[in-house]
UniProtKB/Swiss-Prot annotation:
The keyword Transmembrane helix applies. Pathway: Phospholipid metabolism; CDP-diacylglycerol degradation; phosphatidate from CDP-diacylglycerol: step 1/1. This is CDP-diacylglycerol pyrophosphatase. It comes from the Bacteria. The chain crosses the membrane at residues 7-27. Its main location: membrane. GO terms for biological process: CDP-diacylglycerol catabolic process; phospholipid biosynthetic process. One of its GO terms (molecular function) is CDP-diacylglycerol diphosphatase activity. The gene is cdh. It comes from Citrobacter koseri (strain ATCC BAA-895 / CDC 4225-83 / SGSC4696).
Amino acid sequence: MKKTGYFLLAVVIVAAVAGIGYWKLAANPNALRDIVLQQCVPNQLQQQNPAPCAEVKPDAGYVVFKDRNGPLQYLLMPTYRINGTESPLLVEPYTPNFFWLAWQARSFMSQKYGKDIPDSAISLAINSRSGRTQNHFHIHISCLRPDVRAQLDDNLAKVSTRWLPLPGGLRGNEYLARRVTESELAQRSPFMMLAEEVPDAREHMGSYALAVVRQSDDSFVLLATQRNLLAFNLASAEEIQDHQCEILQ
């Protein structure tokens, strides 16, 4: 009976997730890609005007776009087709280090806010294939939830230079955490670190969500959560962010 019960529960969960996925796809999952490829890039190349993006860097291969959700949230996106964390391009050495580029783009938040925002209040996040609403690669540049900030501060000494479970997880979900220096983050993509250092991750990159947060000792913590349908975890690292930016109040 127990096995049957677990099987039925799994079926219900999978059906529910499929329903969520269908609902997401109904809202044009290519909207961001259309904005980047049909508006931002052509406008920059033809008129030297990045609108509706805030910035377009064709040679570097990325754009920065003001998201409509929240007063300070921005997105960093490639100028070419990459769907998301499942893309094999992200573990190729010639692919731009999008997380490092996104960290540089945090200055747009301060410009919008009208004064400098402390690095400790900023986070970067990308959702997994099951945890996203859009099928064009995008890193969320936004404020960090105050409770997540407090939890990361409490666990500062427990974060290793190896991928290890973060004590207590975050937002009710299990996370792996890894400490990196600013130099390491600048030189090596977090996607590469995850794929090369976590067993079996390379074959299942699309099931992972990733986040980057600055720590009080000036290091960075990389955070990764993997889809787990039985635990109701769709792997949406955006859950650690607060697009209303309570942390600044």
